[in-house]
């Protein structure tokens, strides 16, 4: 009888241990889940044409919702501002030029190659890869979570994505899939969750 009681006791203790570990792991995962859901929303904006066209992996910017190469063979240049004969601000002024359809914003330039969000075939990088780049201080100009939130909330070229003006044909450019307010809220939720990134390549 006693051996049976000991066996039952061991089974009970083992079951209790497994349950406790499972609950602990579940509770540990819960805070990350909302953060990852928030990141999914952030990612949907970052890979929209208004953002990814200037976060290229190539030596040139892109244009349009189809993300074709910038006309006139405009190139990145040494600092992302073009080259002397085709400097970005030569055409892109501080605001949209509604009469010509040329978009504009303060300090118009390409994002650095360290912040590329697409591959050399012009395809968006995975959510995990973009998240790693966005959260890597060596690539993102040394921004931590709060600095990223401020950047998304106030940077002129980020704000431009929701006020992109008209195309040369007079039609309105598309905006990201979230409103700016929703984008900032998603970024804040992601930052408050500790900027978790999806697993994978």
Listing of model-derived features with the role each one plays in the protein:
Residues 1-43, 63, 76-79, 96-201:
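N-terminal export/targeting leaders of redox proteins
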Residues 34-35, 70-71, 91:
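Short amphipathic alpha-helical surface micro-motifs
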